[in-house]
Amino acid sequence: MKISYGITVCNELEEIKKLVKFLHEHKQKEDEICVLLDRPKASQALLDQLHRWSSANWILLKESTFRGHFADWKNELTKMCSGDYIVNIDADELPTQIFVENIATVLEGNDIDMIMVPRVNTVEGLTDQHIQKWGWRVNDQGWINWPDAQQRIYRNTDSIKWVNKVHEVLQGYKTATNLPISEEWAFKHPKTIERQEKQNNYYDTL
């Protein structure tokens, strides 16, 4: 069972450094890390880091241009992947050690096309005004919209594709399930309020 960890990145240097190092340390030997870079937005420091990893065979790197269509972008990432299953992770997310070390076993024991992954969203600097403005739910731990399950694990087959320009979703799978709704299986997704506001404003332009 080979897993392809598929990552899209544009300018998240510090975040992707944590992510790639973590995946490299904990993944199976046969697994691969595929990185699709939005080249026009990349800093020289990010380019240099990605090229070092590519030269060391830590990652498979493709440089391209994001044209405002998220499904097309993720489908381009899918084409890079040669694993039996693809785990799609944003550059500013981080899976747990339990997830990376056990997901292949989970997939081997379950003939499933797509699996939803819970996500722990936190925003540093979040105020009550922001929560009301965006209609978010925040629990006692400061997690936003928990469990915020995401379509992030899918069989690598031509029939399963991403659709929609914004708020992209997977289409073409026949069977689906959820990982346990627990922190140990969830992707961590920390942001600052400045980054959140910038991202929300960007989505409004698409």
Predicted regions and their residues:
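Acidic donor-binding segment of Leloir-type glycosyltransferases
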Residues: V20-E63
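Histidine-centered beta-alpha loop that forms part of the nucleotide-sugar donor binding/catalytic region
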Residues: C10, D38, R119
